[in-house]
Amino acid sequence: MGAGGLIHTWAGMGRSVTVLSVTDGEAELPARENLDRIRREELKEALRKLCATHVSVVRLGIPDGRVAEFQNKLRSAILSLIEPAMTMIAPYERDGHPDHDVVGSVCCEIARSRDIPLARYPIWTWQRADPTEFREVSWGKFPLDSEARRAKIHALQCFVSRLRPDRRERTVPRHMLNYFERSYEAFLL
């Protein structure tokens, strides 16, 4: 959601892109059978819509909601993916979702210690943000051309298990999608 346009653009430029899928979000709707498999398929289809089928996807299989318990595994996985001249894109470390916060914090720690450029994307921050939280924060905008924006919107629609308007268990409110359908992506730098 947070960096789909960037993935589309970088993949289209032939840049090496690796997506680290930390969890499958399977605990979000515990009554839903095979949610982990469904979410993996949704990610695969979303990457196809982004024209990023050659993007590497590394799955950690950490249980949803329990990333804090597996920080060493997460750290090791991230360290194993470091390449020269890379840029790291990660969830904002104060996003308000426990798994996003841990992933973002570990990425910040690694980026600082290895001098890797890091941009962090907000997801749940848009829902709950207090503007005073960002007074001292540098923001960057990654502009999306019409093709990248269209690809991102189509990719977002692949996450049916999170977005279907006819389901009681919908997890991402419709109004939140407005933040991800803009002509740019916002990153904390």
Enumerate the language-model features and the residues they cover.
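The feature marks non-catalytic terminal segments
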Residues: E42, A46-L50, H54, S80-L81, ...
